[in-house]
């Protein structure tokens, strides 16, 4: 949120002074994080207010792992509270700062999950003795949605040298709809994420205060419930990580059911990374710690890095 404040307030149309803007920058660089409740306001203005409180030496903030009074946090970082001038209190409460901040985090997570879904889906296709026929470049070319094409290309790249797919070639005429239509499902998701990212990039580089300062008076539209929608998207991305974690754990366990576990180079890398946190399960055991561990790997983009190190860059 503080980074978004710098983007929004630094446009030159808000009337904020440079020293006030500089304090936000210095707080970020010093690792001062205001304690901001995520609920409790009609709309979203309370969130920004808690940041402003620390800037004037009130409220609470964390610094070097310790939660302190706002004034003490500033003091330990060698900073001084600001005395707000004309319009600056309003600036710190107005605009779409929290909306844009939550949406930015949601978009980043969505990008991570989109590529991780390609990875988990490839692993699933292999352990279910699937076929790459539905991912054929010729099929993609006659319905040339770019993101659908990219998804199919990712799956082909991960599974291109799979001994398991070769052993079970012709095992069935075609895979289940949920498997063979991964490009048609995951591709539009990529497009939706890209469209949202383009809109967000404009918003991030906008001036969103009300009123704005021009040579001639002007106004702007107000987005109602924007923060609720952005936070809901962010929370949804968090829950989706657990779904992909469960899929990866099931994929790994399915591979362990085979006597011959030889698989594609890409999926072997996925399996090895998975097994670094999750053991082979030969009896009942609590799964929560393993779900948390794999979810953290997903958050850290570990599966994306591992697969790209094995088969090359994935397409988004």
Regions found by a protein language model. Name each.
Residues 12-13, 20-23, 30-31, 35, ...:
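C-terminal auxiliary extensions adjacent to catalytic cores
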Residues 3-6, 24-29:
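Transmembrane helical cores of multi-pass ion-transport proteins
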Residues 1-14:
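A glycine-rich phosphate/pyrophosphate-binding beta-strand-loop-alpha-helix module
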Residues 38-40:
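Cysteine-centered functional microenvironments
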């Amino acid at each position: 949120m503080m980074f978004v404040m710098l983007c929004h307030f630094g446009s030159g149309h808000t009337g904020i002074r440079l020293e006030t803007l500089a304090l936000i920058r210095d707080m970020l660089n010093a690792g001062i994080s205001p304690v901001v409740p995520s609920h409790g306001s009609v709309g979203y203005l309370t969130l920004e207010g808690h940041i402003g409180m620390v800037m004037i030496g009130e409220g609470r903030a964390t610094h070097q792992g310790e939660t302190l009074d706002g004034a003490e946090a500033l003091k330990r970082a060698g900073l001084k509270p600001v005395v707000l001038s004309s319009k600056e209190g309003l600036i710190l409460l107005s605009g779409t700062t929290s909306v844009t901040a939550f949406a930015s985090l949601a978009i980043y997570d969505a990008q991570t999950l989109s590529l991780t879904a390609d990875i988990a889906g490839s692993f699933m296709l292999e352990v279910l003795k699937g076929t790459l026929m539905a991912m054929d470049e010729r099929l993609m070319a006659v319905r040339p949605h770019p993101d659908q094409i990219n998804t199919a290309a990712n799956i082909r790249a991960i599974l291109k040298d799979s001994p398991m797919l070769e052993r079970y070639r012709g095992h069935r005429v075609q895979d289940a709809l949920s498997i063979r239509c991964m490009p048609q499902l995951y591709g539009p998701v990529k497009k939706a994420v890209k469209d949202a990212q383009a809109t967000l990039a404009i918003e991030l580089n906008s001036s969103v205060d009300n009123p704005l300062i021009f040579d001639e008076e002007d106004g702007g539209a107000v987005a109602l419930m924007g923060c609720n929608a952005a936070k809901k998207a962010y929370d949804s991305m968090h829950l989706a990580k657990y779904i992909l974690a469960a899929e990866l754990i099931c994929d790994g366990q399915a591979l362990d059911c085979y006597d011959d576990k030889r698989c594609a180079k890409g999926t072997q890398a996925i399996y090895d990374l998975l097994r670094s946190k999750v053991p082979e399960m030969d009896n009942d055991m609590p799964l929560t710690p393993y779900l948390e561990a794999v979810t953290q790997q997903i958050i850290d983009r570990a599966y994306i890095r591992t697969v790209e190190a094995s088969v090359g860059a994935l397409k988004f």
